[in-house]
A protein has these predicted regions:
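Function-determining sites in protein domains
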Residues: 2-12, 16-159
């Protein structure tokens, strides 16, 4: 009787661990991670490395995109092509992502609720809401470039 109880407990524990791992690694769409039902700000910040190893921040480029506009839909479609999953940093409450030469941020506020998505070129870690998650991609450089091109087209900034 005691052996069968131990076996059942071990099987239940193993099932719980597998369910937890599946939940953590389950792919979630980046397009679904951000609320596109309201205007949002798309900001691109670029850093330039100096000879002494320090970083200089170039002037950020930012634009407010209205819901349903072609630019907002293009941003949503670009994000739909990428997935992310939770990681240990998500559970630990870590909010820091590595620094990169280019950063892209989407921010909106509706009914007092802030929505945020932050991508750093060269990293597969991103800020999603109030936590750090890991993308199912090697790094977000291509996505950052896509979103930067959308912003340049929307704001008329030549690059």
């Amino acid at each position: 009787m005691t052996r069968s109880v131990k076996r059942v407990v071990l099987v239940l524990l193993a099932a719980a661990v597998l369910a937890f791992a599946a939940w953590m690694l389950w792919p979630r769409s980046l397009g679904g991670a951000f609320a596109f039902d309201q205007p949002f700000t798309l900001t691109v910040t670029e850093l330039e490395m100096q000879e002494d190893g320090s970083w200089t921040v170039k002037e950020p480029v930012s634009s407010v995109l209205e819901q349903g506009t072609p630019a907002a839909e293009t941003v949503r479609e670009a994000l739909e092509g990428y997935s992310y999953h939770l990681c240990l940093s998500s559970l630990a409450g870590d909010r820091l992502v590595p620094i990169g030469e280019q950063s892209v941020f989407l921010d909106s506020v509706s009914d007092g609720k802030k929505d945020h998505l932050g991508l750093i070129a060269g990293s597969n870690r991103l800020g999603c809401g109030d936590r750090v998650v890991q993308g199912y991609f090697r790094d977000s450089t291509v996505l950052c470039e896509q979103l930067s091109a959308i912003l340049r087209g929307e704001s008329g900034v030549a690059n």
